[in-house]
């Protein structure tokens, strides 16, 4: 049975998530394809719905906006949802580094020119996208009404670095020229990434270019900057280091994930004094995929509350 449970400050209904098993075998080659968009081109995004409540979704590392298509549709007719591809992901342009302040400012400019042109919007971010969302809310509070942070905290996240060293390393070493189909690529990846859902998540980024497979995200650059991806800027706003985001914040955590820990609570409450922390049972780091009904219910309830 799925339960959606608030947990009081100082408690944690979490246990360590089992990472995909690592293989001793090695792969061989790097195949990536640069985004066709200039590095300063607009971010790619998709809108779903035409409701009065506006919310933007930011995905995690190796994700893309369309990962949230299901939840966006389930929110209902009251919502307009924008699914944004972060830089170096999906159809958005590539860059040469990872800097959360720069990414947040770029997403803010995208929102200011579109979804948030007429006023603040709600913002939801998962994992890496959750860090971007927190930084954006602190740097551009005029753009954000309510904030939802999914299974990440405003601190260093060693879990992300450890897990994605293996996953991105596997992607980069695959000889994509050797595969004639996605099934063949999946079989090769299965020797190193045993979880079929994780493989599906990674292989969504495989594209045919000039008759050959290539990775659409900027995998090599992201791999080189995993330490920065796992970090969190401090201060977020150098010119105003004491700034907080004093709007309602929903902090979702998967009960079977270890990305949110008790020691993260003081910093989260310091930056976001109106935060409410909630855990979702039987859910890991990708809780929107593990428990979609509970996820959508939580998001809708939070965004429609008076």
Q: Predicted segment positions?
A:
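Active-site glycine-rich loops that stabilize anionic/oxyanionic intermediates
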Residues: 52, 60-63, 127
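Short beta-strand-to-loop junctions in surface cap/lid or active-site-entrance loops
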Residues: 42-53
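Conserved alpha/beta-hydrolase catalytic His-Asp/Glu region
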Residues: 177-233
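Active-site loop/oxyanion-hole signature of alpha/beta-hydrolase fold enzymes
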Residues: 39-44, 73, 79-125, 132, ...
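Conserved serine/cysteine hydrolase catalytic core
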Residues: 211-271, 276-279
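Flexible "cap/lid" loop of the alpha/beta hydrolase fold
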Residues: 135-138, 144-182
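Catalytic histidine-centered segment of alpha/beta-hydrolase-like enzymes
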Residues: 283-296
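Serine-hydrolase catalytic-loop signature spanning alpha/beta hydrolases and amidase-signature enzymes
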Residues: 62-70
């Amino acid at each position: 049975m799925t339960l959606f449970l608030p947990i009081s400050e100082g408690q944690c209904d979490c246990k360590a998530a089992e990472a995909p098993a690592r293989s001793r075998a090695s792969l061989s080659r790097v195949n990536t394809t640069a985004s066709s968009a200039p590095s300063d081109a607009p971010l790619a995004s998709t809108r779903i719905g035409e409701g009065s409540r506006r919310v933007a979704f930011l995905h995690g590392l190796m994700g893309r906006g369309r990962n949230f298509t299901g939840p966006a549709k389930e929110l209902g007719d009251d919502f307009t949802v924008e699914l944004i591809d972060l830089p170096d992901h999906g159809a958005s342009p590539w860059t040469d580094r990872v800097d959360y302040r720069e990414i947040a400012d770029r997403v803010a400019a995208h929102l200011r020119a579109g979804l948030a042109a007429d006023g603040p919007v709600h913002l939801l971010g998962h994992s890496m996208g959750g860090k971007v969302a927190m930084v954006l809310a602190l740097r551009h509070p005029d753009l954000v009404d309510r904030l939802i942070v999914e299974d990440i905290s405003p601190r260093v996240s060693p879990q992300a670095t450890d897990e994605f060293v293996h996953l991105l390393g596997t992607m980069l070493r695959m000889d994509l020229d050797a595969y004639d189909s996605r099934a063949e690529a999946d079989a090769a990846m299965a020797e190193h990434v045993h979880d079929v859902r994780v493989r599906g998540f990674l292989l969504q980024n495989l594209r045919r270019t000039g008759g050959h497979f290539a990775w659409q995200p900027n995998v090599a650059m992201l791999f080189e900057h995993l330490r920065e991806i796992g970090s969190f800027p401090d201060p977020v706003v150098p010119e105003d280091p004491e700034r907080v985001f004093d709007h309602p914040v929903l902090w979702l955590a998967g009960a079977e994930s270890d990305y949110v820990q008790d020691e993260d609570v003081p910093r989260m409450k310091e930056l976001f004094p109106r935060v409410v922390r909630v855990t979702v049972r039987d859910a890991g780091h990708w809780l929107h995929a593990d428990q979609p009904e509970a996820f959508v219910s939580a998001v809708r309830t939070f965004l429609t509350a008076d």
